[in-house]
């Protein structure tokens, strides 16, 4: 059986509306995006900003990773650099289109996918997260948190 056949790939989506509160942009508190059970292969993870992010104070940052490795996918990025209609695939988000970087595809994980705000709060904005994955273990699954 081919690992990357359309029949074994699953897609899940989650939209986060940041408001600066705990779990939604408060610095130092994780933003839960996807809950992972078992082992899964991330085929592709695509964060797309639909409403630009703002900060409550200078230099608010946002990283994307998993519990225990908070920058596995994307290192800390200044929140105000993530604008509407941009793909947040690295620390310099891109409009229009971009080749998906290696850090956002073909990654094996067992932990929940989270965003980590730091320094000051990410006060407003919206990011949609689209994930395509393949379960590796019999209990491998991902759901929106």
Predicted features and spans:
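Surface-exposed, low-hydrophobicity beta-strand/loop segments enriched in small/polar/acidic residues
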Residues: 1-145
């Amino acid at each position: 059986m081919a690992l990357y056949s359309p029949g074994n790939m699953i897609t899940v989506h989650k939209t986060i509306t940041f408001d600066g509160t705990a779990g939604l942009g408060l610095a130092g508190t994780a933003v839960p995006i996807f809950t992972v059970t078992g082992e899964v292969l991330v085929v592709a993870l695509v964060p797309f900003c639909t409403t630009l992010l703002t900060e409550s104070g200078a230099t608010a940052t946002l990283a994307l990773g998993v519990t225990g490795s908070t920058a596995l996918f994307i290192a800390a990025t200044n929140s105000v650099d993530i604008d509407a209609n941009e793909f947040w695939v690295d620390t310099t988000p891109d409009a229009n289109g971009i080749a998906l970087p290696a850090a956002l595809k073909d990654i094996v994980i067992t932990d929940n996918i989270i965003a980590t705000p730091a320094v000051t709060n990410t006060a407003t904005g919206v990011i949609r997260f689209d994930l395509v994955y393949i379960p590796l273990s019999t209990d491998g699954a991902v759901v929106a948190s």
